[in-house]
Amino acid sequence: MKTVRKTSVFPAKRDVVFSKLQELSTLQYIAAPYATFTPIDSAQPVVWTVGSTSSYRFRLFGFLPFGTHTIHIERFDRDGIRSKEGNEHVPVWNHPIILRDIGDQTEYTDQVDIEAGLKTVFIWLWAKAFYAHRQKKWIRMLKEQNHEYNRN
């Protein structure tokens, strides 16, 4: 098993970050173009709550099919999220997200434990780049929203 851990300071209060974490559109925005997540059951809205499980068509770089990715939520509160995830190619993708309030900003940590047999090292290398990318997109999104809020 290999672990990726990435921490950044986000330019928004923890409640704002937690609110955005609850939206599938946030995941879809921050993951692109490294990955795309399309709900299997598009007729049902995605609602992440403790105990919920949801499945997505997962594509690497938006076009390479990489199986059905399942997310099971074990914890979901203002301090963060813990999910057990995986797919046919990566059976273990355990992902705590830790949110720490630091005034008008939030310390945000992604930690991912990965197990994919012989593919683990390659998936781990991709995941290091993916989580650095995700956090940069988070920061860009929050800055743009803050700019829009201040303009109005």
Task: Give the label of every model feature segment.
Residues 84-129:
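Beta-strand/loop substructures that line and gate deep hydrophobic ligand-binding cavities in soluble
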Residues 17-21, 27, 73, 99, ...:
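Hydrophobic pocket/interface hotspot
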Residues 10-12, 58-62, 75, 89, ...:
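Beta-strand elements of well-folded, non-transmembrane domains
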Residues 3-5, 65-70, 91-96:
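Short, surface-exposed coil-to-beta transition loops
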Residues 1-47:
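Hydrophobic ligand-binding cavity/cleft-lining segments
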Residues 39-86:
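Glycine-rich portal/gate segments that line the openings of hydrophobic small-molecule binding cavities
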Residues 13-15, 45, 74-79, 98-107:
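A short, structured loop/turn motif at beta-sheet edges
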Residues 114-152:
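A conserved amphipathic terminal alpha-helix motif
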